């Protein structure tokens, strides 16, 4: 087994799918949008410790989620921070996190890493023909019908609870 194969089991893009594998462990959720915040929320109920790492000084995700996460004793926010290195010989052992303001670097021991970045919809071109929600997703019901007759939206470009390959198909 190569190092990449080992990391594949410890680096996830889906907290719903893989969160239970990290019960009572220390993990990090990376990102600043609603997907990252939802991941952190779910992980906080399962894991001993959850770091939320975001490169900016504030989250772009739903404000309601931000406030809710502050009530969890096992969540620690690392704002203005980025992961610079993933460490481990045969498994994920830690990450090197750099604070972009102070330049300070910290090694965080981790059992799992959940990546939730780069999930911003690119739907602006549809704004003139159908309705978008406050986050830029196309408003559509479970039948994929939009507010405009004859226009349907399928996949992760539309408003929905989960964004995964299996639910986008």
Q: Which residues does each predicted region cover?
A:
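A Rossmann-like FAD-binding core segment of flavoenzymes
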Residues: 45-141
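Generic hydrophobic/aromatic pocket-lining and core-packing "Φ" positions
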Residues: 40-41
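Active-site acidic short loop of glycosyltransferases
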Residues: 24, 110-111, 148
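Short, small-residue-biased leader/transition segments that mark boundaries at the very start
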Residues: 2-7
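FAD-site-proximal beta/loop scaffold in flavoenzymes
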Residues: 8-21, 117-167
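N-terminal Rossmann-fold NAD(P) dinucleotide-binding loop
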Residues: 36
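Glycine-rich Rossmann-fold phosphate-binding loop(s) that bind the pyrophosphate
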Residues: 31-33
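Beta1/beta-strand and adjacent pyrophosphate-binding region of the FAD-binding site
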Residues: 26-29
């Amino acid at each position: 087994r190569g190092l990449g194969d080992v990391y594949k089991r410890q680096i996830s893009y889906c907290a719903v799918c893989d969160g239970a594998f990290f019960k009572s462990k220390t993990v990090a959720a990376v990102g600043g949008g609603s997907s990252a915040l939802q991941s952190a929320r779910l992980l906080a109920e399962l894991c001993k410790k959850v770091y939320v790492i975001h490169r900016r000084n504030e989250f772009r995700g739903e404000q309601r989620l931000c406030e809710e996460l502050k009530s969890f004793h096992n969540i620690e926010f690392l704002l203005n921070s980025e992961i610079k290195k993933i460490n481990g010989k045969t498994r994920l052992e830690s990450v090197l996190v750099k604070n972009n303001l102070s330049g300070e670097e910290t090694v965080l021991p981790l059992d799992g890493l959940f990546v939730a970045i780069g999930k911003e919809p690119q739907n602006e071109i549809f704004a003139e023909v159908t309705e978008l929600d406050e986050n830029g997703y196309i408003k559509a019901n479970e039948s994929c019908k939009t507010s405009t007759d004859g226009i349907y939206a399928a996949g992760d470009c539309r408003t929905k609870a989960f964004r995964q390959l299996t639910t986008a198909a």
